[in-house]
């Protein structure tokens, strides 16, 4: 017989265009703690979890645009999220924009409670 896992779907709420990454990460960690309090084994965050939905704006400044993308996962800014998950013993999955050289891809990372990490990439349109 298979084992049962409990998955929490995290509702992020809005992220403003200029919300600092630290504020967003704090919200994510609070949601992760809340999911753990409901005995969730995994918490699922939505796509573009770390930023506002930036494609809605015509952003011409390449530097500003690059700020919405991740160059590594985990990176220096996102490492506390991974550490929080390890401390809580909870897995998570989150979608994020990844800065890469063409072809464009969408990425989703998954951290399992035992720290096994997988990155899934989909071909961009």
Feature-to-residue mapping (PLM):
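Hydrophobic structural segments
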Residues: 1-125
């Amino acid at each position: 017989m298979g084992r049962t896992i409990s998955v929490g779907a995290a509702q992020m709420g809005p992220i403003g265009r200029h919300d600092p990454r630290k504020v967003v990460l704090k919200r994510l960690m609070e949601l992760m703690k809340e999911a753990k309090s409901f005995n969730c084994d995994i918490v699922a965050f939505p796509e573009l979890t770390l930023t506002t939905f930036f494609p809605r704006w015509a952003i011409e400044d390449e530097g500003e645009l690059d700020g919405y993308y991740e160059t590594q996962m985990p990176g220096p800014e996102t490492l506390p999220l991974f550490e929080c998950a390890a401390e809580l013993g909870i897995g998570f999955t989150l979608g994020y924009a990844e800065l890469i050289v063409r072809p464009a891809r969408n990425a989703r990372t998954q951290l399992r409670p035992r720290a096994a990490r997988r990155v899934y990439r989909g071909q961009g349109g």
